[in-house]
């Protein structure tokens, strides 16, 4: 059976938003993705927008209309979340074009219920690749109008629950898709571990009882040995070997009645101790004790392996922290540079007629050349920042006039 697939991811920075826009709306002339069949691109469609849009403008419009937070939005706040809905090729091969569209419309309905219809940006269906899929995007605004990707997306557990809800929703629509086994396997592993812990506690108790019995038997054995050592020396029997010869020892010991009784008790105690020890060795507890020792050694090996893996992960985390610090430094330099370019852009636009038109032509030229595409993206970011400054100043002028 086929599986339902739902993915979401935060989009950081307007340049990444622009890249997603150009990919989704097929604005680039060259693509590294060999799965794209450009002869089929005309079949693509957007379930929200009738024509291509500028993602950044729609994000700004959505925030202007729906944001009601009291604080100013931080420059590094996540304004855009992108996602994907699909299944496998076998699932879509069994559907007609109308049924495929219905599946994606039902999926969009689910997303609108989750994130708010008013916050949805696009729902672009690609039919020009090997497996049909839908790219969707939204502004992570909460029900009370705050901008919070963290609250809207949550953690891994929340994402797992989101996938569960999505699978239930599409199945209610009659698509018969599996959610997958990762969650079930995880729960089984947790249950098995819980049971193992319970069993381990039980066997620890049983093992302690066996140890106590062994110690008791050992003490009795040592006591018997000490008692035998402390017994006073015996007299040896002697006899006359000849009619006229003296008396010689026969090698046999002479015991009094009390000494003989004490010796019998010591021998009986020793026999009981040996019997008890043999009985303990033959019990399941003794066998389980040996098995537990083997399992303990096995678990030690597993723990050591985990420790080695943890050490490697720690080194990797430290490396990533250093890279993050370096990127933050680069980001500060980049922000200062962008601020300078915005100032230069506005000055050139004010003093040189036709500057903006020439800037746009040059930007498009760079975008269509894979070698200079990043330059085009940077120019796009500069224009976006200029537009933000323009809107801010226009709003300030409007507020001043109203006062």
UniProtKB/Swiss-Prot annotation:
Function: The interaction of the RSA site and the PRE protein may not only serves a function in plasmid maintenance, but may also contributes to the distribution of small antibiotic resistance plasmids among Gram-positive bacteria.
Stated family: Belongs to the plasmid mobilization pre family.
GO biological process, one term: DNA recombination
Upper lineage: Bacteria, Bacillati, Bacillota, Bacilli, Bacillales
Region (Disordered): 10-31
A molecular function (GO) term: DNA binding
Gene: pre
Protein known as: Plasmid recombination enzyme type 1
InterPro entries for the chain: Mob_Pre
Start-end of Polar residues biased regions: 13-22
DNA-binding is among the record's keywords: yes
More about this protein: Contains conserved positively charged amino acids probably involved in the binding of the pre protein to the RSA site.
Positions bound to DNA: 45, 115
Keyword DNA-binding set for record: yes
Keywords for the protein's UniProt record, in alphabetical order: DNA-binding, Plasmid
């Amino acid at each position: 059976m086929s599986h339902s697939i739902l993915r979401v991811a935060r989009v950081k920075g307007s340049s990444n938003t622009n890249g997603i826009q150009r990919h989704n709306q097929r604005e680039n002339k060259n693509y590294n993705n060999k799965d794209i069949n450009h002869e089929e691109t005309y079949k693509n469609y957007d379930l929200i927008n009738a024509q291509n849009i500028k993602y950044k403008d729609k994000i700004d419009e959505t925030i202007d209309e729906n944001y009601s937070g009291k604080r100013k939005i931080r420059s590094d706040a996540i304004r855009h979340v992108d996602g994907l809905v699909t299944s496998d090729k076998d699932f879509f091969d069994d559907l007609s074009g109308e049924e495929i569209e219905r599946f994606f419309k039902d999926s969009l309905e689910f997303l609108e219920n989750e994130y708010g219809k008013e916050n949805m940006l696009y729902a672009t269906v690609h039919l020009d690749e090997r497996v049909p899929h839908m790219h969707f995007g939204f502004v992570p605004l909460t029900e009370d109008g705050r901008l919070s990707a963290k609250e809207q997306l949550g953690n891994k557990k929340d994402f797992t629950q989101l996938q569960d809800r999505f699978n239930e929703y599409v199945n209610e629509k009659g698509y018969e898709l599996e959610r997958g086994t990762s969650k079930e396997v995880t729960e089984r592993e947790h249950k098995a571990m819980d049971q193992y812990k319970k069993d381990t506690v039980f066997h620890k108790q049983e093992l302690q009882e066996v140890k106590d019995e062994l110690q008791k038997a050992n003490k009795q054995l040592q006591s018997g040995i000490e008692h035998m050592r402390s017994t006073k020396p015996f007299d040896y029997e002697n006899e006359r070997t000849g009619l006229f010869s003296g008396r010689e020892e026969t090698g046999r010991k002479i015991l009094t009645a009390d000494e003989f009784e004490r010796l019998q008790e010591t021998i009986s105690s020793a026999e009981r101790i040996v019997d008890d020890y043999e009985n303990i060795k033959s019990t399941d507890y003794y066998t389980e004790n040996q098995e537990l020792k083997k399992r303990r050694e096995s678990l030690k090996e597993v723990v050591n392996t985990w420790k080695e893996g943890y050490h490697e992960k720690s080194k990797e985390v430290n490396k990533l922290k250093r890279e993050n610090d370096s990127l933050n430094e680069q980001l500060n330099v980049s922000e200062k540079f962008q601020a300078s370019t915005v100032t230069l852009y506005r000055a050139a636009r004010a003093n040189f007629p036709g500057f903006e038109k020439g800037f746009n032509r040059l930007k498009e030229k760079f975008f269509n050349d894979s070698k200079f595409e990043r330059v085009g993206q940077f120019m796009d970011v500069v224009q976006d920042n200029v537009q933000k400054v323009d809107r801010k100043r226009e709003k300030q002028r409007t507020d001043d006039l109203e006062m």
